[in-house]
Amino acid sequence: MCKECDHYDLHYAPGAGVSRRHVLDQLAMGGLASLLSGLPRAANAAKTEDETLRIGYLPITDATPLLVAHAKGYFEEEGLKVAKPELIRGWAPLIEGFAAGRFNVVHLLKPTALWLRYGSHVPVKVVAWAHTNGSALVVQGDGGVKSFADLAGKQLAVPFWYSMHNIVLQYALRESGLTPVIKPQHAMLGPKEVNLQILQPPDMPPALAAKKIDGYIVAEPFNALGELNASARVLRFTGDIWKNHPCCVVSILQPLIEKRPAWAQKVVNAIVRAEIYASQNKEEVAQLLSRDGAGYLPAPAKVVTRAVTAYGQEPVYKDVIRHAEWGNGRIDFQPWPYPSATRLIVQQLKDTKIEGDRVFLDKLDPDFVTKDLVDYVLVKKALARYPDWWRDRSVASGDPFSRQEVLAL
């Protein structure tokens, strides 16, 4: 049994007229445009004169800088009025709320931000990375899976098609001679096929414990939760496949940035400061965010601490980490949005199987997206103000603003 897994039900979100299950299904199929047709246009979201910072977030460690900035009062110290961050119980309602203007700052999966801007015409701008690394592929502890090659014929869950999880997983499967497919769960699979399905993060540990799936790839703390409460075992950490990869990014709508550039700069200043604090105080931050601390996350401190700190020093990961020389952590915190990573994400998405309309992907130019998706000005000013950001282990040596992407199984 998966003890405590029920504490992580993210499906229910109060206060909206659209079925959250329907929204999730539509999002997974790429149908955001039709969903938003009855909502306020995203471009109009900036027209309100209310400058209150309204944060929406999922209860995952990817949201750490937004939550630490709130908990430590960094937003207020920038002169901002801020509402208490609102925990949203799934990607679908978070995306919908952001596009409709309910939230003006959120964390999004980097590929989701790309999909929103170019596939659904929501004017998203990435203003900073929220973290690096921070995810893993876990499998049944007694399932006999020792390598990616052993996943042939298995059922794996990903949190969203437009996610780093889906990109990294499918890369690893292809490199292992396997073919990722998207079929009904009970469909026959070829000898080298691995079936993928969308599953909400809180559903993953109980589904694994009940042997409804053979593994899942997701953000923390659901890997740590699986290890501690669902007899799961980490097969690989995503940061050990794509060195210091982005995952969630801090996002603001472009019309709001253009209307209130000083406001947006203050937001990014506070977030950069929070990432520095999180990088230098991981154990304290884990306790702070947990339900045993300030309660931003429903997970207990034991789970969040493992999710943030347990990595190379753990004997159980001796054969899990293949690139110890990379020197990264289980999750790290640095805000600079490396252009090389955006370029590689676009390139990898073109080779990644995704359910729904993906025609826009075939037309995307990686160099154009690298320049257009990200606002580099705000974050660069914030980094100049808080230069300690470069001390995080995931910042490139030499020129901290440039790096070469490393993707290796």
Describe these PLM feature segments.
Residues V68-H70, S135-V145, P246-A262:
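A bilobed periplasmic-binding-protein/Venus flytrap-type ligand-binding module shared by bacterial periplasmic
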Residues M1-H22:
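N-terminal secretory signal peptides
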Residues K110-T112, Q185, P201-T305:
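Pocket-lining segment of extracytoplasmic ligand-binding domains
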Residues R54, P59-L87, L116-G119, Y171-E175, ...:
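Short, polar/charged alpha-helical segment
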Residues A63-A69, I88-V124, S135-A149, H165-I167, ...:
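Pocket-flanking alpha-helical
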Residues S19-S34:
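N-terminal export leaders
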Residues E51, W115-V127, L173-R174, L178-P180, ...:
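Ligand-binding "clamshell"
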Residues E258-L361:
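Secondary-structure end/capping motifs
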